[in-house]
Amino acid sequence: MSAHLQWMVVRNCSSFLIKRNKQTYSTEPNNLKARNSFRYNGLIHRKTVGVEAWPDGKGVVVVMKRRSGQRKPATSYVRTTINKNARATLSSIRHMIRKNKYRPDLRMAAIRRASAILRSQKPVVVKRKRTRPTKSS
């Protein structure tokens, strides 16, 4: 089935839809922006890109759909773990999408999602408040 026909079926009746505050979001896997739109849908396209947090808390996992294994869902996704510093992680995601000519329209969304995940994994430094000496009269 073509992606457009699948979109016409899935767009208003999917178990991943969340309709709140006059907006429609989607919680499906490989949807980079969590928007219910044709471009970012992770179920209907032959090529999809997803970025997830690594379960250990350091690094990200890039999930790409194989073009060849469409009829075998168990083997249709390739998961690549990237556990480097932030700049190297983002550049390797950029190269994975650009050099393989793999959905260039999702490149910036994937980089932004990975950047947000890496930022959330950084430890939070608690700043101590300076105590002012009391004024003596």
Swiss-Prot record:
PANTHER family: 60S RIBOSOMAL PROTEIN L28. Component of the large ribosomal subunit. The modification N-acetylserine is found at residue 2. InterPro entries: Ribosomal_eL28, Ribosomal_eL28/Mak16. Belongs to the eukaryotic ribosomal protein eL28 family. The gene is Rpl28. GO terms for cellular component: cell body; cytoplasm; cytoplasmic ribonucleoprotein granule; cytosolic large ribosomal subunit; cytosolic ribosome; dendrite; synapse. This is Large ribosomal subunit protein eL28. Keywords: Acetylation, Cytoplasm, Isopeptide bond, Phosphoprotein, Ribonucleoprotein, Ribosomal protein, Ubl conjugation. It comes from Rattus norvegicus. Component of the large ribosomal subunit. The ribosome is a large ribonucleoprotein complex responsible for the synthesis of proteins in the cell. The modification Phosphoserine is found at residue 115. It holds the Pfam family Ribosomal_L28e. GO terms for molecular function: structural constituent of ribosome. GO terms for biological process: translation. There is a cross-link at residues 58, 65 (Glycyl lysine isopeptide (Lys-Gly) (interchain with G-Cter in SUMO2)). Its main location: cytoplasm. It is found in: Cytoplasm. It comes from the Eukaryota.
